[in-house]
Amino acid sequence: MEHSPEEGASPEPSGQPPATDSTRDGGSGVPPAGPGAASEALAVLTSFGRRLLVLVPVYLAGAAGLSVGFVLFGLALYLGWRRVRDGKERSLRAARQLLDDEERITAETLYMSHRELPAWVSFPDVEKAEWLNKIVAQVWPFLGQYMEKLLAETVAPAVRGANPHLQTFTFTRVELGEKPLRIIGVKVHPSQRKDQILLDLNVSYVGDVQIDVEVKKYFCKAGVKGMQLHGVLRVILEPLTGDLPIVGAVSMFFIKRPTLDINWTGMTNLLDIPGLSSLSDTMIMDSIAAFLVLPNRLLVPLVPDLQDVAQLRSPLPRGIIRIHLLAARGLSSKDKYVKGLIEGKSDPYALVRVGTQTFCSRVIDEELNPHWGETYEVIVHEVPGQEIEVEVFDKDPDKDDFLGRMKLDVGKVLQAGVLDNWYPLQGGQGQVHLRLEWLSLLPDAEKLDQVLQWNRGITSRPEPPSAAILVVYLDRAQDLPLKKGNKEPNPMVQLSVQDVTRESKATYSTNSPVWEEAFRFFLQDPRSQELDVQVKDDSRALTLGALTLPLARLLTASELTLDQWFQLSSSGPNSRLYMKLVMRILYLDYSEIRFPTVPGAQDWDRESLETGSSVDAPPRPYHTTPNSHFGTENVLRIHVLEAQDLIAKDRFLGGLVKGKSDPYVKLKVAGKSFRTHVVREDLNPRWNEVFEVIVTSIPGQELEIEVFDKDLDKDDFLGRYKVSLTTVLNSGFLDEWLTLEDVPSGRLHLRLERLTPRPTAAELEEVLQVNSLIQTQKSSELAAALLSVFLERAEDLPLRKGTKPPSPYATITVGETSHKTKTVSQSSAPVWEESASFLIRKPHAESLELQVRGEGTGTLGSVSLPLSELLQEDQLCLDHWFALSGQGQVLMRAQLGILVSQHSGVEAHSHSYSHSHSSSSLNDEPEALGGPTHPASPVLEVRHRLTHGDSPSEAPVGPLGQVKLTVWYHSDEQKLISIIHSCRALRQNGRDLPDPYVSVLLLPDKNRSTKRKTPQKKRTLNPEFNERFEWDLPLDGTLRRKLDVSVKSNSSFMSRERELLGKVQLDLAEIDLSQGAAQWYDLMDDRDKGGS
């Protein structure tokens, strides 16, 4: 404890006169100013100087003309810093007092507020280890001497060499203090292995450490004065051998992130500002976690030539837990309205944590009984020790409200195999429903087919279920190529499986690096996936070698393991990489758990499955039984092109002056209505709009067409026409000028086309490309597929209040289109037998969402089916039971059909589909419906625009990459059209990937009227744009121009400068604008801008 000078002064010896009496000035009678008076005056001046210094910012703000807001902001910043600082000092003092005298402090603070005690204070059921603390206390001063040498002789030179601005960096003070690290208790776990000892050490460090640094060149001082660190450190002694020192190695790591609190000094005092304080502590903890928190660990070998060091440093996981976050119920309401007078609900979401693995669910708005239906897979490294933690929050604009948490030791999941329970939330109210499955790691591929078949029936969100795990032990490389100028590279490795990429650390100035790192990947289907390895310089611009390894190769290897050298391609002749690849199949052992009767239905607990069962109940069907009309729908594509000789309805000056009309078209077909835009003052309008509608082959249907003149009061009638759908569906195509009825004059140009869905995905990419070509600006995006859904029934739906069956109905939604089924009264096994069809524009990106709800009871369960899964199935169809989130299953059939137009070019290049699948041929000439057949317009000439030269492997890519363009001239609309499809193999300058976009100019004009630009794509060398641009130009004017296409990237976040990645310039006079074929063009630099 520090003392004032008065408290520490020694008393005067008795018998001596006071010093003040012998030093008085006899002439004046006033005592001279002694040391005490001088120090008191200095203290007064110091206090006055501090107050004056506080007023300096206020004066400067006023002199600069700044508002009082800046002064208030600075004051708030200071008060926040002071509050954080005082809190840290108070916590440090309380912790030190507790360590100094545990019994007395515990008794005195029995009723102390929890805010006054450190968060780590607890009394774990572990053994005391005071003897160990005495050893640490004895060693502590010598450890301080070692740290001082380490920082001064190793760390300081490294810092000075890292940056020229830190040439004067030095440690001015290094003291670990007098408070050593304490071990509160030790717990020894029984290990399943005989050659291993597991220890858990509850460590607590409340130290008076002081480390000061200085950069003399900039008069900058900073440091640390006091620190707290508390956590559970696991120590593993393995392998135990029969030779001294008995223990082969010691592994140490924190099972969970320890708590950290640092008291800063000097310039680092700024880190105590609110916001910066949490950010700095988080960054420091991230650094600690990078090498000392699971799955990372510190390995200290105790014997030379220890075998399987990589396996000890990064052992295989104990298992995988598949966490199904299903639902919650009875949550507390946190949203209040009208200043708390009206109680609302909550917008709950959940955070799931296992060690450093964290997952966040989606937010369910306005719901106290949310259903998430999400699945996560976590790696379990240590049992016992790791915990599953679920925290539920209410999403708010400012700060999210805490609704409760639950914790569960992963050892209980290991023992049970499967746990499906409602768990109460601590610190709040309500329960959360979790289904936890322990997946064992099998060292052979015998059960892989069974696992894959099971996973196909699991509806998992947000990621599909995994069938295997791959662990890559990256050891070292040899004889990598040198950089330019024979400089040693700084190699690092990028490992990728599908869309997941991991990066190793960089090793500097060597062409034979040693990494000794481990990486883990989840695999959905190891038979078809690959491991892509890229060895690069740390700038990421220079590739030192590459390797692509099909993972199917491991399936035939012994114990699914490859431990060998791999030769690198695109590298030196002797360049190679040493790795150990270990694959394990994820298997859920159902030997004691009942299988679901149909793949796709999750296994619910036996009691709930047997409730209400009957011996005489009929067997549950495996597949749906739709009626004969299901899946026979077609799509009618309606092109409303133009009209001629419409009658004039507008009159001016009381009818004396004859004007024109403002025409638009209304369409009615199959219960749907459509309307074109209005063309102002034109008797020969051009609309060029496309509409699509799902139609059936029921006879007697008609397409009703009416033309009106738009007016302020009542729209005037300009004519009508009716087309029989039977005729269009039989012929497949109609392109006619239709004479309008009930009016003196006028005719309408209409093009109708029947699109029959095809159950093959081979033509999907071509369909998407053709749709982008014939797309018009005033029409919505064209459909590429038709989705047909048949919902037959549901089973095992949850009961209301635990006893009463619900009255369920289902809602099927795709995009913005929904279909609601009938409501079945009071049944937990409803039968709907309803179908619905949806137009699909982007099959790769859209999904089918099904919700089962009860009248007055809310959501009973839901299913999300990405349509990309249908594209991978035979006949593009799934027909089985789907598990609902929460409880229950539905029997549903979902089938996709690709909409191939024979009159837009796909058919000319399609060889993978037999015409026998179509109900009728579309190759016949269309029959006239009221007039001679009109010649096909240039829109139909798209049929020969798709070429097979589109393949990326057709020609080598240039050094700057390529851009894929379609350029053609629409003679009907007199427009130049360009589609920017994508880029590939763009160059990378610097460490970060570019953020590319494409800028298009129509030279010689460089103004804004001809400039077009795509959206920016983030961090990619192979961006996909699919953007369409148009210019209104006559054909002769188009042929005199050049199309300048530039691929650019933002240079930095703060800069407006744009980096040119490459460009190409196309002379439109030299291009066949009637073909419009998509083509790859090599990008050039600014000096050479020619086309490919």
Swiss-Prot record:
Entry keyword Repeat: yes
Subcellular location: Endoplasmic reticulum membrane; Cell membrane
GO cellular component: endoplasmic reticulum membrane; plasma membrane
Entry membrane topology: Multi-pass membrane protein; Peripheral membrane protein
Residue ranges, annotated region (Disordered): 1-36, 604-628, 909-937
Domain annotation SMP-LTD: ranges: 125-303
Location of Phosphoserine modifications: 314, 807, 937, 951
GO BP annotations listed: endoplasmic reticulum-plasma membrane tethering; intermembrane lipid transfer
UniProt cross-references to PROSITE patterns, sorted A to Z: C2 (PS50004), SMP (PS51847)
Name the record gives this protein: Extended synaptotagmin-1
Taxon lineage: Eukaryota, Metazoa, Chordata, Craniata, Vertebrata
